[in-house]
């Protein structure tokens, strides 16, 4: 887990995007200083590499609350309107890998809530799902991502998906 302390890095801004039926997204912009050879001074360690887990926390030191948990997906250099060089990290929630690749699968004699828990469990996520009641003899996932299939099954049962870290 990465800890970016404002005394260590000059954090320009941090944005967190959360919505129902969407995977959380966050961006953090850190000041990147220009050195003599017109190269950018990017932190030399690997804490900003894609795949690194990151946690956004805020509040007084005795009452810190977590606003976002996820992993770095991309990093880039940008120049803003004030000609300030920024090192921008884009992060996604832990459910993000469920959007990779379309899959085919058949679930037999299963309830939708059990299927949702099983799929999300493959990505190290825990799910709190209301009971869906009806056992379906054969449920087919055809050429869609696991995330899209989870959303479809939740919507068919009048449920919404809200991600929060590894839940």
Predicted segments with their positions:
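Juxtamembrane "anchor/assembly" segments of surface/extracellular structural proteins
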Residues: 1-53, 87-98, 130, 159, ...
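Short, acidic/charged, Gly/Pro-enriched secondary-structure junctions
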Residues: 1-3, 38-78, 113-122
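N-terminal export/assembly leaders
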Residues: 25, 99, 116-141, 167
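Aromatic/His-enriched, Gly/Pro-containing loop or helix-boundary segments
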Residues: 42-43, 100-111, 132-146
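Polar, S/T/G-rich
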Residues: 59, 63, 107-122, 142-156
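Signal peptide-directed extracytoplasmic domains
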Residues: 69-76, 81-95, 102, 110
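Short beta-strand-centered interaction patches in the first periplasmic/extracellular domains
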Residues: 79, 86-95, 131-167
């Amino acid at each position: 887990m990465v800890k970016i302390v404002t005394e260590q890095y000059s954090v320009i801004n941090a944005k967190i995007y959360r919505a129902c039926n969407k995977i959380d997204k966050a961006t953090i912009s850190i000041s990147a200083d220009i050195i003599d050879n017109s190269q950018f001074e990017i932190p030399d360690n690997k804490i900003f590499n894609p795949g690194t887990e990151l946690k956004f926390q805020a509040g007084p030191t005795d009452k810190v609350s977590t606003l976002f948990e996820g992993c770095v997906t991309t990093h880039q250099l940008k120049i803003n309107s004030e000609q300030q060089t920024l090192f921008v990290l884009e992060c996604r929630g832990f459910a993000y890998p469920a959007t990779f690749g379309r899959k085919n699968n058949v679930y037999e004699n299963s309830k939708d809530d059990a299927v949702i828990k099983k799929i999300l469990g493959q990505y190290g996520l825990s799910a709190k799902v209301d009971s869906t009641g009806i056992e379906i003899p054969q449920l087919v996932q055809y050429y869609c991502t696991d995330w899209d299939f989870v959303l479809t099954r939740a919507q068919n049962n009048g449920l919404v998906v809200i991600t929060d870290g590894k839940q």
